[in-house]
Structure formats: C-alpha cells, structure tokens
Amino acid sequence: MNATSLRQWAKTGDSATARMLWRAAKALRYGSVPCIPAIHGPLYALNGALKNGFGFIVRTVWTTPLFQSRLEQPAERLYLYGGMPLVLGPVKISMGSDVRLSGHTTISGKPTSHPAPRLEIGNNVGIGWQTTIAVGSRIVLGDNVRIAGRAFLAGYPGHPLDAADRAAGKPCTSNQTGDIILEKDV
C-alpha cells in the first residue's frame, strides 16, 4: 500500500483503525506547543531582529549595489525593498535621489526600439509592489510621483494587434509604441 492509498483509506475508511489513524494525523498536523509568553515573546522579538538584520545586510551589501550597476549613474539614497527588480531588454534607466522601489517590480524595454528605450525616474518617487513598467520609447516619472502596487505602465504592448502578424511572431509596430510622462507631484 503506497502513501496515497493509505491516506485515502484513513480518510474514508469505516473501520475504527482508519478513523483513529485519520484523527491522529489531523492532530499531528494542527499540533503545537503551548505558548509561554515569557519565553515565546523574546523569541519572537529575536526572530524579527535576525530577519530584519539579515534583510538589511542583503539589501545594503548585495541587491542595492547590483541594481545600481544597471543604472546610468548611481542614485542617491535608493531604497530597494523585498529583493531586486527584474530588468528586461535594452532599457536605459536614470534615477533621481530618495527613490523607493519594490524588488518585485519588472522594468522592460521594447527589444526592437532604436535608440534604446529610456526610463527617467525623478526625485522622491515611490514605486509599489508588483508594478510593471514596459518602456516603448520613453517613460518619465517626475518628482514626487507615487505608483501603487500592481500598476502597469504600458509604453508598448509586446505583440502586434494583427492576428496574422502575432501568429508569425512579429514584433509590435512602431505606431503601437508611445511615451508615458507622469508630471511632477502625480
């Protein structure tokens, strides 16, 4: 009897052994040690301190410098949180100071653009979690711009509108590509 059939037998069986085995398995799954606040409170605080300390070291020593190397010039006081953004394609990125950028952000440049697509991010800009910025030719985010999580700025669609061209694997056409400019304080 393999593990799957044993599980099914214990879950649906009518015998006392099957019911007892299923109750024991559920008790193990939901089991826990009783909480002792004097012990578990400090352990919880230690867990948070270790996690935050390790995250700080990884962010300052690893992810921020690596991402800065992808920029045209390093950005002052760049704050990456939650990892490193995914950058795809030949996009050129310039960034002002005091930018907060989620590590779960995707920045892509249209592969067939010439010259290379440009993403210009001003000062004091916040870009939220799971935001996608698809740069067709140029996207400008002015100073003090806030972009919520899961936003999508589409400067190009990534495929042609014509079904035959799409099926042939052709790239999107130049008339489908546009600039996106979010002025200051948007």
Residue ranges, per PLM feature:
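Domain-scale signature associated with acetyltransferase and cell-envelope carbohydrate enzymes
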Residues: 1-160, 176-185
